Amino acid sequence: MPRPTKTRTVVSEPDVCYFKPRGVPLRMLREVGLTVDELEALMLADLQGLPHEEAGRHMNISRATFGRVVRKARKTVADALVNGMAIRIEGGNYLRTGPDGAVLFCGKCRQEWPVVSSGGTPHECPMCKKEEDKKAEK
């Protein structure tokens, strides 16, 4: 049985969560999925040019894990570009850090709730009751 995926830290939600080739109706397109944490990895590595070790620290994961995440993200984007597919950005196991500290985020229904430093933070989504894997820390 594989180990559970470690919660990754991202700075913000993407403003745009869908891309498709111009001039092709959506109903005629195949679609690939890119998770929010994979998008964050692309931003850190390719847009900001951070070394994998530093980018991994930003996301609260190891350098090796960051390398696997960014490699999968690049493969997904390349597949979509080369084969003319749409890209949907959603989901993933991540913790979004906000201006006032950490918040938990449900990948299923997109609900957010704050992390309480006293340890009283609920570990399930208040909306859909999806159980969270890890306790987030500030």
From Swiss-Prot:
InterPro entries: RNA_pol_sigma_r3/r4-like, UPF0251, WH-like_DNA-bd_sf. Pfam families: DUF134. It comes from the Bacteria. Belongs to the UPF0251 family. It comes from Desulfosudis oleivorans (strain DSM 6200 / JCM 39069 / Hxd3) (Desulfococcus oleovorans). The lineage of its organism: Bacteria, Pseudomonadati, Thermodesulfobacteriota, Desulfobacteria, Desulfobacterales. PANTHER family: PTHR37478, UPF0251 PROTEIN TK0562. This is UPF0251 protein Dole_1957.
